[in-house]
Amino acid sequence: MGTGASSIAGPDGEGGYRPGLEDLPEACVACVLLHLDPPEICRVARLNRAFRGAASADFVWESKLPSNYGYLLEKLAQEEDGGGHQRRRRAKRLGKKEIYASLCHPNPFDGGTKMFWLEKYKGGICMSISSKALSITGIDDRRYWNYVPTEESRFHTVAYLQQIWWFEVDGEIEFSFPAGVYSLFFRLHLGRVSKRLGRRICNPEHIHGWDIKPVCFQLSTSSGQQTRTQCFLDGPGNWIHYPVGEFMVENSDVLTKIKFSMTQIDCTHTKGGLCVDSVLIFPSGVRPEKVFVHDR
């Protein structure tokens, strides 16, 4: 016993070795990491080897993935023309951490007209639906509408309205959402955006008619949920997320069909000067990023 004690004791008889974080079993560390958000897991992985190993454990990251992540991977595999089998094989070789990271990037589907990604802190599903995936009254008549290229859209194109009497934009999506509450927004901009000599310019030339009558926003789901709200469009020069409403998903194993629209069909006056970028779906409580705000 004395020999064993002397091998641990320092020259003054005091313990020369003190347990530290690096002595924690990797399995214990992994159990602690289950209670952290993904960005926090990545930060503590830098502490030492035990934390680094635990931060790569599949069971840690599987707990962060949405319950329908298999559906998401299959959705992406179907997007690859003739390469779906290769993507499925690659996904099987990936660890859960790599799968989480790949799903946090924008993932286009339906021919690139829609995309989804994971909100990195809680792993909730976020979605963006481009103007080209929407049904817009008069979109094929260039007297009324044009598609305008811009860097201010995830899809690099927005639908620009010059002038119209009957304003109606409709869309729908059928998707397997994890159980939870979601918010839906239209991302709109009054004025045509362009760049001149590297500077952002908003042309207000065609803006009119939006202060006379409000725009009606509507949302309905295959489970019978409905919301309706009205709002005047304002804030020229800014991208604004106009809330349409919330919907609840109770069963992630069942596809949820969502229909949404915005209309201003009072034909006593024309309206124009509006950019329609996309429709956004976010987990309730997660605010869409506020970007491209014009300096007034």
Protein language model annotation of sequence segments:
Residues 1-34:
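CRL adaptor-proximal regions
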Residues 17-18, 37, 172, 230:
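Residues at structural and domain junctions
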